[in-house]
Curated annotation (Swiss-Prot):
Residue positions binding Mg(2+): T16, D50, E110
Pathway, per record: Cofactor biosynthesis; biotin biosynthesis; biotin from 7,8-diaminononanoate: step 1/2
This protein's name: ATP-dependent dethiobiotin synthetase BioD
GO term, biological process aspect, one: biotin biosynthetic process
InterPro entries the UniProt entry points to: DTB_synth_BioD (IPR004472), P-loop_NTPase (IPR027417)
Amino acid sequence: MKRYFVTGTDTDCGKTFVTNQLVNYFSSSAAIKPIASGCEYSENQLVNSDALLHQQQNHLPLEVVNPWRFRLPVSPHLSARADGASIDVHKVADYCLNLQLNDIKKLFIEGAGGLMVPLNEQDTWLDFLKLTRIPVILVVGMKLGCINHTLLTQEVFEINKIKCQGWIANCLDQDMLMLDENISTLEAKLKYPLLARTNYGGKISDICLSSL
């Protein structure tokens, strides 16, 4: 089973939407969101709306899709602390590396927040990637400032020798000035391919998804 870690240039860049689109595009694929904050109680259990989308799409138990759940809608390390818990990045890494799902050929692992979001007092998603070496798919929320955010993310990948499989342009605002020019700028400056594009909540448009 191939595994990909889906991260983004920012919070609310559209990771969950794009991840769901990838699962729709690829047969025999599934998605999980191992850590989620901002959960609410429903039927006597904590539920995160993003993880619930994956669970409903995959028809997997919520405990498989989202084993680490916390209440407050803040950074995972703060939300866990507020719940009297802590996140062990090694346990998260082991879970994501060892999870086996019948008939699934591609597993998309959605992170919470961006690459440098703290999971505990020492570790971030970057440390998770150093442990697992799972290749990354970068979701770029196309908005003002995205070029800077994306190039900074690329710098972190390169310094830490993290493999990025490619990036997806998630077009959030149909009124964004010079949208196509922004995408072209990123294509010229990034060292990994543009895999796909999504337009304002529409279906994913394949550009280079066959490389996954």
